Amino acid sequence: MTWKKFSGEVIHSSILEEVEKAILRETENGYKLKVCIGTDSQVKSSHTDFATVIVLLREHHGGFMYIAQEKSTLKMGIKERMLLEVQKSIETAYSICDLLDIYDVDLEVHAD
């Protein structure tokens, strides 16, 4: 999965390394962080676009995010698509949850 900053800049390191750098930078600047993860999808005529985001919120000071986009040509109903959204969010959360525990950063996974 290719991760990008909201600006479109591609992340060349692993998302785990990028999130750790962000946590260190933001906590050194005095911010308490919270991470929110979610996935949404949009059905097109020939495929479905999925976007998973990792949002780092600075308590009372805005935030920033990383986004990974994927396309699927599989035909699926809304229930299957929603379950796939939840799966992508949970997989992303599992990939960084140990890091968040180390730095005592709260995690929220959106499953809607």
Task: State what each model feature region is.
Residues 36-39, 108-112:
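Short glycine-rich or small-residue beta-strand-to-loop segments that form or flank ligand, phosphate
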Residues 37-38, 44-68:
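Acidic, metal-ligating active-site segments
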Residues 72-102:
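Acidic helix/loop or adjacent segment enriched in Glu/Asp that either coordinates divalent metal
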Residues 28-31, 100-106:
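Short helix-terminating capping/connector loops at secondary-structure junctions
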Residues 14, 49, 84-87:
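Conserved active-site and cofactor/substrate-binding residues in soluble primary-metabolism enzymes
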Residues 31-47, 72-84:
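Short charge-dense sequence patches
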Residues 1-36:
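Basic, amphipathic N-terminal segments that precede the first structured/catalytic domain
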Residues 65, 70-71, 107-109:
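Generic structural motif
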